[in-house]
Curated annotation (Swiss-Prot):
Record-given protein name: Putative leucine-rich repeat protein R380
SMART domains found in the cross-reference section: LRR_BAC
Gene3D superfamilies: Ribonuclease Inhibitor
Disulfide links within the chain: none
Length: 421
């Protein structure tokens, strides 16, 4: 877990002049104090401190190491620091959200925990043989040599420009989201991977993996994962699934699956917008809690599972809606899209035919009937004119289009076994 002041809120806009010192635990918390400098004379306890929280201030400089001879944990995030002194006994260091570009003074140090995230272009080529947790996300780096951290357990290098990452046998948790990585090497101990929004085409088998998140990649096949419990792989090109016998939660929406074998352990299933003819959940009907599908699949399985369905919720997917509305340039601006989204989401499904007709009438009048006619006609004449418009083939085609958009952009959530989110 990332370090922070545990007496004050996370918002950097919230300050208090309360200082807390715990002589038994040997820690001092002066976070959120709007401090521009630290007057050593005000804090005689510095010489005994093992933990110091000075986060969320306006500090440009840290105390000289001679005044903190026993310090082991230092949290100085959210300041304007450019340099970090060397504290020889330090094992935990959080310098996130500063302007530091170099921490070479800690090369071969005893650090177990290092958070240097949100320091643009920071140099990470330092050897930390004992480091267990490293956070270097949002740092605008393009390269990370993780072999410099041979005992690393947790790594977060998300939101960077990294294209390659090496293998490391000790790693159990990896976050590489929002990079340019094309390949995942072997990590024999890995338990959790977060690799969304990269350029992955393939995910190898990880024998101990419990959670895998790889949305927005180019993955075609999900390989065997013997212990995997959670899979989030939406917005890929998946056409094939390996053996996933322990899966409880899986999101494979927006892929290219023609069929899927759902494991008996599955509880939360998201399969909308694939190429299914139908979906069979007989194998997990006793334990499934939530199933999300598109309208096409819903219409095919509703009667089969009618007695098992506890509740139904229908929502419109905005991306799909916007995609279809682009066929009419007049419907593609953000205001109109949001208006239609809200109207679609307000439809009770048993009334959807009537509601869709009303929505079609309103939209057709808005974009196709000239303002001149509206302004120059009296109400009776205009109503008569508009009723004649509704009988034209142009309107009928438009109404059919709105129905098509609705049916192809809604997501139907089915709840089972007494569960509702």
């Amino acid at each position: 877990m990332r370090a922070k002041s545990h007496r004050y809120p996370e918002s950097s806009e919230c300050y208090t002049d309360t200082t807390y010192y715990d002589p038994e635990d040997k820690y001092l918390d002066i976070g959120f104090q709007m401090l521009k400098s630290i007057n050593i004379k005000r804090y005689p306890e510095f010489s005994y401190l093992e933990k110091l929280f000075i986060n969320n201030n306006n500090l440009k400089q840290l105390p000289d190491p001679q005044y903190l001879p026993k310090i082991k944990e230092l949290v100085c995030s959210y300041n304007i620091l450019t340099h970090i002194p060397f504290y020889p006994n330090l094992i935990k260091l959080d310098i996130s959200h500063n302007q530091v570009q170099n921490i070479n003074v800690y090369n071969q140090s005893k650090l177990l925990y290092l958070d240097c995230s949100f320091n643009k272009n920071i140099e990470t080529r330092i050897f930390l043989p004992e480091c267990r947790e490293l956070y270097v996300n949002d740092a605008n780096i393009s390269k990370l040599e993780i072999n410099y951290f041979p005992n690393l357990r947790i790594l977060d290098c998300s939101n960077n420009n990294i294209s390659r990452i090496s293998s490391l046998s000790s790693l159990i948790e990896l976050n590489i989201q929002n990079n340019h990585i094309t390949e995942l090497p072997s990590y024999p101990q890995l338990v959790r991977i977060m690799a969304d929004n990269n350029k992955l085409c393939y995910v190898p088998t990880f024998p101990n993996l419990l959670s895998l998140s790889v949305s927005y990649n180019n993955i075609v096949k999900i390989t065997d994962q013997p212990l995997l419990k959670k899979l989030v792989a939406n917005n890929n090109s998946v056409i094939e699934l390996g053996n996933l016998p322990k899966l409880k939660f899986f999101d494979l929406s927006f892929n290219k699956l023609n069929s899927v074998t759902i494991p008996s352990s599955a509880k939360y299933i998201f399969l909308q917008f694939n190429n299914f003819v139908s979906v069979d959940i007989d194998n997990c009907i006793g334990c499934v809690k939530e199933l999300q599908v598109d309208f096409n699949i819903y219409s095919r399985i509703y009667s089969k599972y009618f007695d098992n369905i506890y509740a139904i919720n229908i929502q419109t997917n905005r991306d799909k809606l916007h995609y279809y509305l682009q066929q009419y340039s007049q419907l593609s601006n953000e205001h109109i899209v949001n208006q239609i989204l809200n109207k679609f989401n307000g439809i009770k499904f048993k009334e959807h035919t009537k509601k869709l007709f009303g929505i079609s009438v309103g939209l057709y009048e808005l974009i196709f009937v000239s303002q001149t006619i509206k302004n120059t006609s009296d109400k009776e004449s205009y109503d008569k004119y508009f009723q004649s418009v509704l009988q034209t083939d142009y309107f009928k085609k438009f109404y059919e289009f709105i129905q098509y958009v609705y049916y192809n952009s809604i997501i139907v959530t089915l709840y089972f076994n007494g569960y509702i989110s």
